Amino acid sequence: MNAPESVQAKPRKRYDAGVMKYKEMGYWDGDYEPKDTDLLALFRITPQDGVDPVEAAAAVAGESSTATWTVVWTDRLTACDMYRAKAYRVDPVPNNPEQFFCYVAYDLSLFEEGSIANLTASIIGNVFSFKPIKAARLEDMRFPVAYVKTFAGPSTGIIVERERLDKFGRPLLGATTKPKLGLSGRNYGRVVYEGLKGGLDFMKDDENINSQPFMHWRDRFLFVMDAVNKASAATGEVKGSYLNVTAGTMEEMYRRAEFAKSLGSVIIMIDLIVGWTCIQSMSNWCRQNDMILHLHRAGHGTYTRQKNHGVSFRVIAKWLRLAGVDHMHTGTAVGKLEGDPLTVQGYYNVCRDAYTHADLSRGLFFDQDWASLRKVMPVASGGIHAGQMHQLISLFGDDVVLQFGGGTIGHPQGIQAGATANRVALEAMVLARNEGRDILNEGPEILRDAARWCGPLRAALDTWGDISFNYTPTDTSDFAPTASVA
């Protein structure tokens, strides 16, 4: 739906007082060829009835850059032709006549270097409540290399983390301590020890365990690190537990992080809800203190899940990689949380690629050169168990943390047995894959064979079998049918 020529008003009329259509003010240019240094954004827009989609696209470009509702004479005091964002392409969304994909280019000089807070204030700060548009969703972005290089990125990255842990050739295993609220510090530490002793690499706090009346944060840190040290000594492996330092102020978060470091922790955790400035600040602290930063995407579903309005998680994942987290929850596709398999694999691409290629089936609209930025370790967590090990490895490969919370803590023979079941299932599946077997199709047979020699795995398969959460995902690809993982 490219316009054959510019519809911008003549220069003199452009600055006449009054209200003018956005496309006439210069926010639409169907002939524009994006520059390598432009920042590109793709919006899914649903214009109000009777609103021209090109005008709606121009409005998005205007309201996310320099425009207001009327002509202002102070535009003449700026290089406004450069600073105006330009909507340059509008495509209909397949099988949805009310929606359109709107491509917008922004000049790099509109953004502060190394600041996700500044980026988001422009791109999503105002346009989502604009009346001429029923709904808008930010689907994807492309950052120019010059912009990417202003960010330090992950403080540790996948390669360095594996070297510190001395664990290669397989996914990492973890579990979230359950119940996530209510345990005393001592009992919490007990759960951590049992999980790590049974074969897990990590245990972790959940998103809402901070410092409550039933367990002060300092008690939790002390008991957890005692458990980590004892499990490491018992197994001869490097172990860890994600200590959640999320708090009400940055000062308190730094205090908790410093205490975690003083106890010998290799990793701390924060929640997405702390905000972008806090995330970048904690990443800087981790870089200075040789710590791994785990991010729980708490709250993301409030704006990522609905397909017609909000922000796609692939965009959030790109922002988080720039912001500098080492781990982020990215979905399982087979668990209890929202996730179309192809779409979720697109999130993993964003985390682990050196160069992400456009792939519409995975929701990736742009090529992205990550300019040697370190890679993020994706985390699959939420409603998964040992019986799904073949599906998880087939979907996500080795560079992923597989976290079995209920699938460890809920084991009928106890926590340590639950951890052992997951470790044996993982080792058996990796061995079978390395031998050239088709683990996706032969996976259940491989697990049954391994369970003949492992009572905890046999009990896990008997308890959960092939339990899955078969609900239709809401955020699916517009260019490919929802894939089956069975």
UniProtKB/Swiss-Prot annotation:
Induction (record text): Total RuBisCO activity (both chromosome and plasmid-derived enzyme) is high under lithoautotrophic growth conditions, intermediate when grown on fructose and poor when grown on pyruvate.
Keyword Magnesium: yes
CDD domains xref list: RuBisCO_large_I (cd08212)
A Pfam family that the UniProt record links to this protein: RuBisCO_large
Binding site for Mg(2+): 204, 206-207
EC number(s) per entry: 4.1.1.39
A GO molecular-function descriptor: ribulose-bisphosphate carboxylase activity
Gene Ontology BP annotations: reductive pentose-phosphate cycle
Chain sites annotated for binding substrate: 126, 176, 180, 297, 329, 381
Catalytic activities: 2 (2R)-3-phosphoglycerate + 2 H(+) = D-ribulose 1,5-bisphosphate + CO2 + H2O; D-ribulose 1,5-bisphosphate + O2 = 2-phosphoglycolate + (2R)-3-phosphoglycerate + 2 H(+)
Modifications made to the protein after synthesis: The disulfide bond which can form between Cys-278 in the large chain dimeric partners within the hexadecamer appears to be associated with oxidative stress and protein turnover.
Cofactor notes: Binds 1 Mg(2+) ion per subunit.
Residues modified as N6-carboxylysine: 204
Sorted UniProt keywords: Calvin cycle, Carbon dioxide fixation, Disulfide bond, Lyase, Magnesium, Metal-binding, Monooxygenase, Oxidoreductase
Cofactor: Mg(2+)
Active site: 178, 296
Site-annotated residues for Transition state stabilizer: 336
Record carries keyword Phosphoprotein: no
Gene3D superfamilies the record matches: Ribulose bisphosphate carboxylase, large subunit, C-terminal domain (3.20.20.110), RuBisCO large subunit, N-terminal domain (3.30.70.150)
Family label: Belongs to the RuBisCO large chain family. Type I subfamily.
Additional record remark: The basic functional RuBisCO is composed of a large chain homodimer in a 'head-to-tail' conformation. In form I RuBisCO this homodimer is arranged in a barrel-like tetramer with the small subunits forming a tetrameric 'cap' on each end of the 'barrel'.
Assembly: Heterohexadecamer of 8 large chains and 8 small chains; disulfide-linked. The disulfide link is formed within the large subunit homodimers.
Entry function: RuBisCO catalyzes two reactions: the carboxylation of D-ribulose 1,5-bisphosphate, the primary event in carbon dioxide fixation, as well as the oxidative fragmentation of the pentose substrate. Both reactions occur simultaneously and in competition at the same active site.
Name of this protein: Ribulose bisphosphate carboxylase large chain, chromosomal
Gene: cbbL1
